[in-house]
């Protein structure tokens, strides 16, 4: 089990069954340009390599300025990662970009620099990790045990005069708008997945991270979604990438966690209930781009 699989079940239990029980695969689509998943991987890796290279790991505004003032370094890094992730080269990663990869490189460099400008606003912060994978062979939720795995995009600790706090960061290069009216919305398939998926993921990340790491039981942990497409507007308007439930910014996942874990426990019980069939979603909007729509017979 993983956060993405749990979100699939919320979207449509039948899709979850076809994909993760029967093991049916989605057809890979041919695209003329870079697909969103590959673009997201490139952005993730760019940010990871930059922050992994930092020494010390306390990131000051001056640290970020040194990167922003060295555009050639960021361009070179983009070339290497595009050649690896998009062109699938195993060697000669410094090969000059040609054709559509030139445009991809310009877009990647632009967005990485914009994200760094945003990070400069929250500096100083202690960079802790990127692409942190963790798993458990028998995670007990309610009365059910299951294998679980997650990968957190980034973890850092903002150093503030008002008190330090940990951030669990998820980069999103799609159209996610993580803002729901209530915790119930996170488990409601009639609510647009773009509004609930990222926050559901982050709440699970926070829970499992605290269980997996000693010393964070009482520490403030803030879930954050870096919406890459929105970074320009965020910088211009002075906004943040914080997420909201109702009208309230989620500054600590614990403020909502008792209710969240209660609903999550109910969901897991439903998923493992042998008397509960895997039914179609009630929200036909979830079917529009489903690869299994012909199998289930839903008329979209």
Where would I find each of the regions flagged by the language model?
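RecB-family 4Fe-4S metal-dependent nuclease core
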Residues: 1-300
